[in-house]
Amino acid sequence: MALFRKKDKYIRITPNNSLKGSVSHNVPEVPDELFAKCPACKHMIYKKDLGLAKICPTCSYNFRISAQERLTLTVDEGSFQELFTSIETKDPLRFPGYQEKLQKAKETTGLHEAVLTGKAMVKGQQIALAIMDSHFIMASMGTVVGEKITRLFELAIEENLPVVIFTASGGARMQEGIMSLMQMAKVSAAVKRHSNAGLFYLTILTDPTTGGVTASFAMEGDIILAEPQSLVGFAGRRVIETTVRENLPDDFQKAEFLQDHGFVDAIVKRTELRDKIAHLVAFHGGGQ
């Protein structure tokens, strides 16, 4: 009997074709270019609020920026003279897909390689400058990166210039094998010659600075600065924990941790780096 029939758990709705098309599909789309999500605090940020320095207004996280953006923030307008743009990798291993990956990175970043090198003025002080860009194959160090930085030091010796390097890297470039690892020794030898000439070398560690770059010229500066919360290390956290069989501190391999343990001289806000560089260069004799 219908009187004792169990009631349906859900309401039944009969499709009505007359309703089709009555709902507007003209929902405005928000362009991806307008907002960015902060990796640290997870807030959605209107990109214009990040400013030129690209610093999160909520938690002060420093977004990764390109070499060109770094150049704009650091040097005197119109003073940069790019050098060593004609050096090309020989692709010693004929690594499959490597040339295509290089070409894509060049098109995406507008750079010749993972490091931008040249001479520039910072508040009237002339310097030899290198800026690594993590957007170019994670700023991995191959033969071209090593050669460009080595030549920069050699030029600095000839012209009696201080060297300033913004480091960022995922390590040695695996597509070039042992040749990429040899760049560590080559650049370090150039750093030593520059030091023997009595010239100033300043490094600024940015996020991330890891692998062979950390194990060589990144940590060889006369003074070592770092941006806040930058990841700086050699091997990865999980590799170390597996090896030593211990849990590492939460802030392990952060710039602040390195400063507390004497590996970094100072943590400097991105917006203050230009003034700090100019001050340190002038204090150590300046660039002629």
Swiss-Prot record:
Which residues are in the CoA carboxyltransferase N-terminal domain? Answer: 34-288
* InterPro entries in alphabetical order: AcCoA_carboxyl_beta (IPR034733), Acetyl_CoA_COase_Trfase_b_su (IPR000438), ClpP/crotonase-like_dom_sf (IPR029045), COA_CT_N (IPR011762)
- What domain of life? Bacteria
Instruction: Provide the primary localization.
Output: cytoplasm
Zinc finger spans (C4-type) are: 38-59
Q: Which GO terms describe its cellular component?
A: acetyl-CoA carboxylase complex
Record localization: Cytoplasm
Coiled coil (UniProt feature): none
Gene3D superfamilies (alphabetical) = 2-enoyl-CoA Hydratase, Chain A, domain 1 (3.90.226.10)
Q: Which cofactor does it need?
A: Zn(2+)
GO molecular function ontology, one term from the record: carboxyl- or carbamoyltransferase activity
The reactions it catalyses are: N(6)-carboxybiotinyl-L-lysyl-[protein] + acetyl-CoA = N(6)-biotinyl-L-lysyl-[protein] + malonyl-CoA
> Which terms under GO biological process does the entry name?
fatty acid biosynthetic process; malonyl-CoA biosynthetic process
Tell me how the cofactor is bound: Binds 1 zinc ion per subunit.
Provide the binding site for Zn(2+): 38, 41, 56, 59
Keyword ATP-binding tagged: yes
Cytoplasm recorded as keyword: yes
Question: Keywords in UniProt for this one?
Answer: ATP-binding, Cytoplasm, Fatty acid biosynthesis, Fatty acid metabolism, Lipid biosynthesis, Lipid metabolism, Metal-binding, Nucleotide-binding, Transferase, Zinc, Zinc-finger
- State which pathway it belongs to: Lipid metabolism; malonyl-CoA biosynthesis; malonyl-CoA from acetyl-CoA: step 1/1
Its EC number(s)? 2.1.3.15
Q: Which PANTHER family match?
A: ACETYL-COENZYME A CARBOXYLASE CARBOXYL TRANSFERASE SUBUNIT BETA, CHLOROPLASTIC (PTHR42995:SF5)
Quaternary structure note:
Acetyl-CoA carboxylase is a heterohexamer composed of biotin carboxyl carrier protein (AccB), biotin carboxylase (AccC) and two subunits each of ACCase subunit alpha (AccA) and ACCase subunit beta (AccD).
Main role? Component of the acetyl coenzyme A carboxylase (ACC) complex. Biotin carboxylase (BC) catalyzes the carboxylation of biotin on its carrier protein (BCCP) and then the CO(2) group is transferred by the transcarboxylase to acetyl-CoA to form malonyl-CoA.
Query: What family is reported?
Result: Belongs to the AccD/PCCB family.
> What is the protein's name according to its record?
Acetyl-coenzyme A carboxylase carboxyl transferase subunit beta
Q: Which organism is it from?
A: Streptococcus pyogenes serotype M4 (strain MGAS10750)
